[in-house]
Amino acid sequence: MEKMKAKHIPRIDIHDRIELKNALPLRTPYVIYIDPCDTCNFRCKFCPSGNLELMKKTRGRGHGPMDFEMYKGIIDSLQEFPDPVRVIRLYKEGEPLVNPRFADMVRYAKASPKVQRVDTTTNASLLTPERSLEIIDAGLDRINISVEGINADQYRDFSGHKMDYQQFVDNIAFFYDHKKQCEMNIKINGDILTPEQEEEFYRTFGNITDGINVERTIEYWPKYNDMKVGFDEGVSLLGGAANPVY
């Protein structure tokens, strides 16, 4: 492997990390996830958000970009906590940059005395130079970029998205060149790569990011598909009646 600027680090943010067992009970949450948009412009094979038919059947999904006034209310409500929240994570199920006011969301959170850091995870397909400058100037502390292939054909096959791959790489390089305070990390699913393609991934992105990583999937629940597990949508995780609020 050729020498590169980036360090091999996971996308998990371990900034100022404290073991939870030594901090309980918490006075204030360490991390709060807020989904700027619960829909995505990709149709990745591994992700439920890319399955349009499934999302149509799923209660509470398909709202699109979060209303900015609702978002402001969430950030304002953090005043009720005694301490600042360590991280506001602007990412959950959808693609954050589908929300046209993403930079405003970053800026509003960073202006709050109850927020220490703001980060996000994105597929970066909408990360144009103009939006990059907006997001950086808003004060984003960390951006994780999920790469889904090493060429346009692989992207189209894996994520159902047609793109100008070289422009995609150039846009990421632009963000890196102008990132100021923002820490940058790029990762890819190594299960879709040959050893030669993995080397190409490092050559392409290894000098335009702070951190880089090839992730591997593991079997989280062995033999799950062989188990006969009943599921009742009317029952909550705690055993009571499920009463979704939309």
Identify the meaning behind each predicted range.
Residues 82-91, 111-119, 136-151, 165-228:
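Conserved C-terminal portion of the radical SAM core fold
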